[in-house]
Amino acid sequence: MRTLKLGGSTLDVPVIAVGCMRLDSLDRQDAERFVHTALDEGANFFEHADIYGGGRCEEIFADAAGMSSSVRGKMILQSKCGIRPGMFDFSREHILASVDGSLKRLKTDYLDVLLLHRPDALVEPEEVAAAFDELEQSGKVRHFGVSNQHPRQIDLLKKYVRQPLVANQLQLSITNANMITSGFNVNMENSAAINRDGGILDYCRLHDLTIQPWSPFQFGFFGGVFLGSDKFPELNTKIAEVAQKYGVSDTTVVMAWLLRHPARMQPVTGTMNTGRLKDCCKASEVHLTREEWYAILLSAGNVLP
């Protein structure tokens, strides 16, 4: 498994992050098999959130991993906080309480990475800064980042927060690629030219934030998986063609498409199927050509100006 430096930090992480949002759909035996398959593949970066399964996913993960100090040393744990029923909450009290809850459920005394999950309209950045300081000084969190945030929101936090922000988790896939396509539609009058995220892709590259694409196989906002979908026949044909060339699965090609981007992204898997997880990890070994990358992008209905 190839690795990258997370943001501007010295933390080496695998290029594939293992998402644990659906871990509560597995029984104990399957959860154990899933976690240990990931570790065997070199995908030791596990991605959580306090709300996944109402907290159960973190508990299931710790039990499945057989969490101990020696096991903990073999993995990198990231969790997110800031979502409550009916609201978002970046208050100092909520951030601190959320981290304590995650640590208890994960049976560990520290998180390698903490992300703020979704932008809080009532954010008081001074409170975020105070929470981050306490978490860093206590050793409970080693690195910090954000999720689903645009450049101005990040700049507001950076004005007050002392710690470097190392990651931004964003929805991105072949069929949800406005973050990419708006860049080459500059100065055009078509809908693809609409900048919906403040230029977050280039911002993250300029400011050393690793982009972690979530839902890399989805179209729309959890609209469904595009692989095998009759909504994307041309895309599926092209992906299958490239997969055959490299002797890999369609799943591998989808992840390789994201890894081909020079922003050095870290896609987050969502599957609970060990076979598909292995296919995702194989993308680390596949380097698409420029021609293949663009052909896949265009086959999804994206158009060059």
Question: Where do the protein language model's features map onto the residues?
Answer:
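Acidic-and-aromatic substrate-binding clefts and catalytic sites of carbohydrate-active enzymes
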Residues: 23-29, 49-59, 84-89, 120-124, ...
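Structural motif corresponding to the early beta-alpha repeats
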Residues: 71-93, 117-118
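Beta/alpha (TIM)-barrel catalytic core signal, keyed to glycine-rich beta->alpha loops juxtaposed to Asp/Glu
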Residues: 125-305
